[in-house]
Amino acid sequence: MQSEDKLCVVVLFGGMSSEHEVSRVSAGTFVDNLDRARYEVLTVGITREGRWLCTEATSAQMADGSWEELPGNMPCVISPDRADHGMILFTPSGQVEKLHVDVVIPALHGLWGEDGTVHGLLELAGIPYVGCGVLASAVCMDKAVANALFDAAGIPHTKWLSACRWEIESDLDGVCDGAIAKLGWPIFVKPANAGSSVGITKAHDRDELKQAIALALENDHKVVFEAFVDGHEVECAVIGSDPAVATRPGEILAGAEFYTYDDKYKNGVSQVVIPARLSEEKLDEVKTYAAMAYTALNCEGLARCDFFVEHGTNRVMINEINTFPGFTPISMYPKLMEHEGTPVPALIDHLIELALERTEKQHG
């Protein structure tokens, strides 16, 4: 029996992307910090194969992957029918049970989760959800589209170009020649649609460039090439939409040539400095560009805007926007918000309020 006094919040986690493991940990932060006096919490895991299971797993079981084997898991779907406005559960006894859902937290990273696909389903269902909408989620996920929009908005960015699989397969040497001529060495090679530094390589010569392209194509059908920026990485948390509010940036002290997936989530060698080691004027400049980029790409709810600050020139250049940033214990977004005076439980409350307010404005 659902409580009429509490909001029913569904936390989605897992997914079919290469960032499945990170999502499980991020979702655990929400599960552990949602106020049970205010919310009825349901957790729904999406396996790597794409099965949706309603589970009573703890955050520890979610993180280590053992949640999938729990005997109480029930297959479920989000109904696109607005009359249902929620979940459909398929019980072990063969019954079909409908649950009203007030808001969804899509704690999903990468493709088939952070790219607007799940958001479109929730829009069809008329269910409020935390974070950016369909358009912003899709364009921020595609680095080539995002870069083009940054250029159009006048937000500084390093030199770049992109190529699709068919272009590469038909003329690999021509694609390499174009990238070398425009960008010089070294070149960062990235899948257009991936996050958490998955599939990214720093190429120093032609052989490495070809290997990097092959790796990127394992993760996406489109490849982005970017000129190397000799600088350090800083990140801003942005929240809201009317107006967007950016925090003071924090700084990543990476343990490798660039901020790798392992640095972020496995080997623990990266460090975070808040605020970033910049002048007050430069801190404000980063904040300004973060709010500009967030607004230009139609972001709502929350996002993390990542920048480079070039050594020597001190020039600020945007790298990318993450529309559902990590919420792991080492993730920058919650650390930045806490530094501004908003601890995780209060942050979650605010994000839910923003989700409900957006739906109210859209649909009345």
Q: Where are these predicted regions, by residue range?
A:
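ATP-grasp fold ATP-binding core
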Residues: F150-D151, A179-V198, H221-D230, V234
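Phosphate-binding site of ATP-dependent enzymes
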Residues: T201-T288, H311-M317
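Rossmann-like NAD(P)H-binding beta-loop-alpha module
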Residues: A152-P191, T201
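Structured adenosyl-cofactor binding patch, chiefly the S-adenosyl-L-methionine
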Residues: A144-A153
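Hydrophobic beta-strand scaffold residues
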Residues: V41, P128-Y129, H157, I187, ...
